[in-house]
Design a protein with these regions (language model features):
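A surface-exposed beta-strand-loop module
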Residues: 108-170, 196, 230-231, 545-551
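Amphipathic alpha-helical substructures
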Residues: 98, 301, 424-512
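Extended, low-hydrophobicity, Ser/Thr/Pro/Gly-biased non-transmembrane segments
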Residues: 149-255, 560-565
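N-terminal, polar/Ser/Thr-rich
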Residues: 20-87, 172-178, 486-487
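Beta-strand-rich binding/interaction modules
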Residues: 113-118, 217, 447, 481-486, ...
Length: 570
């Protein structure tokens, strides 16, 4: 989701590098730092808190998760807007990877486990925090496919930045119900395997019963609705692709539908009656978004399910094939210039950012929450690519320059794996600026865009890790740049501060000494210095080097709009 939906962060040295988020930040960020350099100055990092047991139970890929591979969900629910309750079952299919008699599923303690059935017989289970440990009477064998029916019910408790599962009303007083659970997980409203690492490989079905007169819009392809004869109508959807747990969504309201086919892809849009005309104008931007992102990364990844935009009462969320939209049918982000440089008012930030997650976050998914920069850093960079596709590279550099003040440099982007905790917002802005810096180091746009496509194709429809992403880019760029990129990635992802180029001038002799101030041993990267029309590439290390220059100290520049670094002159 976008930070803007959360609150986005900026870029440091390179005042104009290149791109912004993927999922948005959930709420506007705190006031940007006044430091005009490369983001806020880093301070001492706080000692990491000991993870709570519940965070580990939810976040760790423990033995009773790792012993099975999720195949599909068949989710059937009934939602009561008056009682504010949900009830139903999830048919969970999985294949055993190691023999065992227990698996772990997840359901918030706020909801009841009514029963869990295997071939009609009740299974025993135990609960701890949100974990549900399901016990089988006989050992399940390696390769065995198992299907259980998990029945549940209760009154969901709204929580998290987006509400989890919330029962609201629209301006006309009609029920407006939604799920948004990236923070607290799918377990907040239905039983699931609440792990990004394992997606249902065969997809899922959703059958959602709501009072007559309301509509449910969920993920996947619409397969029809039917009256249940008791005042309820069931809306049926099928997801044809793997889907990460927090992307599964309900959107229930008095929706009006319109749509079209665009270059063979079905586009479906859902808005409240009073906003229908505004939606028909604003949602037309989806076609320009698709033009841009398919240009760089190839076809829309979920063509069998189609692309949808669904109006919601919060900023937005990247629900797979059913992108949630709440940006008030205005350009920018919630009626403001998101990056403060005059570019974002040209487009609807939520449509671009949240849809960008279809490629990075939904098709390519981080296996662990600690690797979430793969979603947010890359999607933020996609914002910049959208600007470049529409208005050119100069405007893209201007746009990314607005990210710099959003970077905080307080804690590393990468957090402890196996813990259900949100990484810092620097994963958006600092992540995007790091990616833009890679492009500047390569200094070959044609090759860069070929590599972007190859990178996406390699990881599409997979869950992956930071280590795998780094390994790919090391192999792709190392032979060209002729240095090991490991320290580069470690400095930006695993360290708090960004590198600072120290410059020491001896103007009498026309000399300047230079080196990198960086925590990471072995850190090096090229950077361009000089003055307009007289740029040269230098290759500093953590040891002093020198060069001759006729440029006065006051005029000597570092191209920080291309390279995300700080600069210190003495």
């Amino acid at each position: 989701m976008s930070l803007a939906a959360r609150a986005l962060l900026p870029f440091t040295l390179a005042a104009a590098l290149g791109a912004q988020t993927a999922t948005m930040p959930k709420s506007p960020s705190a006031a940007a730092p006044t430091n005009p350099g490369r983001g806020a100055q880093s301070g001492p990092a706080a000692a990491p808190a000991t993870p709570k047991r519940a965070e580990v139970l939810r976040g760790a890929y423990g033995p009773f998760r790792a012993n099975n591979d999720l195949l599909s969900y068949g989710l059937e629910v009934r939602v009561d807007p008056v009682a504010k309750t949900i009830a139903g079952k999830n048919a969970v299919r999985f294949r055993m990877l190691t023999a065992g008699t227990r698996i772990q599923l997840d359901l918030t303690e706020d909801l009841a486990v009514d029963k869990i059935l295997l071939h009609g017989a009740e299974l025993k289970y135990t609960r701890e925090a949100g974990a549900v440990f399901v016990e089988f009477p006989e050992t399940l064998k390696v390769g065995q496919t198992v299907a259980i029916d998990f029945f549940f019910s209760g009154k969901p408790v709204s929580k998290g930045r987006f509400g989890g599962m919330s029962f609201e009303k629209d301006a006309a007083g009609r029920p407006w119900i939604f799920t948004a659970d990236e923070d607290d997980g799918c377990e907040i409203w239905f039983p699931c395997k609440d792990q990004w690492k394992d997606e249902p490989q065969e997809g899922m079905t959703l059958s959602v019963a709501v009072p007559d007169g309301l509509m449910d819009v969920s993920n996947g392809r619409f397969e029809g609705s039917k009256s249940l004869g008791d005042g309820y109508t069931q809306w049926n959807w099928r997801v044809h692709y793997p889907i990460n747990s927090y992307d599964v969504a309900l959107n229930i309201g008095d929706y009006q539908h319109f749509g079209e086919t665009y270059k063979g892809l079905s586009l479906d849009f859902y808005a409240l009656p009073e906003d229908l005309n505004k939606a028909k104008v604003q949602f037309a931007q989806a076609k320009g978004m698709l033009d841009a992102f398919t240009h760089y990364f190839g076809p829309y990844p979920f063509a069998k399910d189609g692309y949808k935009l669904v109006q919601v009462p919060y900023a937005g969320m990247e629900h797979q094939s059913a992108v949630a939209y709440g940006n008030q049918f205005e350009n920018g982000y919630l009626k403001r210039d998101w990056t403060g440089v005059g570019i974002s008012p040209r487009f609807d930030f939520i449509i671009i950012h949240e849809s960008g997650h279809e490629w990075f976050g939904n098709s390519i998914t981080a296996a662990d929450r600690s690797d979430m920069w793969i979603h947010e850093g890359w999607t933020t960079y996609l914002e910049t690519l959208y600007v470049e596709y529409r208005w050119g590279k100069d405007d893209a550099l201007k746009y990314i320059s607005g990210l710099v003040p959003k970077v905080r440099n307080r804690t590393p982007i990468l957090t402890e794996p196996g813990v259900a905790a949100e990484p810092p917002q620097d994963m958006y802005f600092k992540g995007a600026l790091m990616i833009a810096t890679l492009r500047s180091m390569l200094d070959d746009d044609a090759r860069w865009f070929r590599l972007l496509r190859q990178f996406y194709d390699r990881f599409a429809y997979t869950t992956t890790s930071t280590d795998a992403v780094i390994a790919w880019w090391k192999a792709a760029l190392g032979p060209v740049l002729k240095f090991d990129l490991t320290p580069f990635f470690n400095q930006y992802l695993r360290r708090t501060a960004i590198p600072a180029l120290e410059l020491n001038f001896d103007e009498a002799d026309g000399l300047v000494m230079y080196k990198w101030q960086a925590e990471e041993p072995g850190f090096t990267m090229p950077v361009e210095v000089g003055s307009p029309g007289h740029w040269v590439t230098i290759r500093p290390t953590r040891e002093w080097k020198w060069m001759q220059t006729s440029i006065p100290k006051s005029d000597f520049q570092v191209r920080t709009y291309l390279f995300f670094v700080n600069v210190s002159k003495t």
